[in-house]
Amino acid sequence: MFNDRYELTDLVLSGQKTQTRVLIKTKDEFLDGEFNWDSAGTMVTFCKNEKEFIDIKSPYFFGEEIAVTQRHKKAGENNTHNTPNTITITDIRFERLQDISDEDCLKEGVKRASLGFYVEGIKVKNWETESHRETASGCLKLFPYPQEAYATLINKMYGKGTWESNPYVWAYDFELVK
């Protein structure tokens, strides 16, 4: 559920990441039409016209408990996160990717530094010319705004141009169950 390349699972297990977005993949011609979503917040119906529609179900539902595991490389005998962990979905929203607020970017795992924002695993290409933050894991790229850091993360995870295409997403708030 979370991308370990950018240490997102670790952020969940430490309580620093409390929100995630899942891209909705369907035929684009339906996404230009009108839509309605059910009161439970688990399904959206897109209507292309009076006769053509498509239902898109949320992969997760309100109150669902989901197991969170670390990649095997990190899960060792001395690892305190080696025990089973779960999160509980506390809110579901349906929105466009670029509708994310600065506050929600931080809930997604973007971190605040004294001179900008960064994401674990997104390193600078040229530390002499780019703003960066030096950490134990290397020189991480600094961004002036949380949305810019999040947009870069999304494009690295899902492919170049994903942020710019502004797809619909399921946005989930969750709590770590101790």
Which residues does each PLM region occupy?
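Secondary-structure transition motif
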Residues: 1-178
